[in-house]
């Protein structure tokens, strides 16, 4: 989603990307989201239960309020524009969407446009069963 920002993994190994993105592998992706109106408990509960988008129900997820107009959501699936569509189902509009974590990898202090290589420890933590790095 070009209107989003934050942590992204760049690799030439498509198998690794597919392993991370497949919902059945339960890799967590955490986002911080700013919306156009106050975040309510009802909204957070509804998002956490799952929402019908793209003719399917999203998987249950974790949510928490970060600010009056902001929340955190942790997904294990990655449907196209998932958070925007889930929010829209409750009449919320996403104003800012930032991925801050993929499993054990955290965005930390990296600014837009900055990058760094993963450490061996991070690689092993991300996909411990893989040995072909």
Please state what every model-predicted region is:
Residues 2-133:
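Basic, flexible Lys/Arg- and Gly-enriched helix-loop patches that mediate nucleic-acid binding at interfaces
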């Amino acid at each position: 989603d070009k209107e989003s920002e934050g942590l992204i993994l760049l690799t030439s190994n498509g198998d690794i990307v597919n392993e991370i993105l497949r919902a059945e592998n339960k890799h967590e992706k955490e986002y911080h989201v700013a919306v156009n109106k106050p975040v309510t408990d009802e909204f957070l509960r509804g998002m956490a239960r799952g929402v019908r988008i793209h003719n399917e129900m999203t998987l249950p997820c974790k949510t928490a309020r970060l600010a009056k107009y902001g929340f955190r959501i942790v997904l294990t699936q990655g449907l196209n524009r998932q958070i925007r569509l889930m929010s829209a189902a409750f009449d919320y509009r996403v104003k800012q969407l930032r991925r801050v974590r993929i499993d054990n990898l955290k965005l930390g202090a990296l600014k837009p446009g900055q990058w760094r290589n993963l450490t061996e420890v991070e690689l092993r933590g991300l996909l411990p069963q893989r040995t072909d790095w």
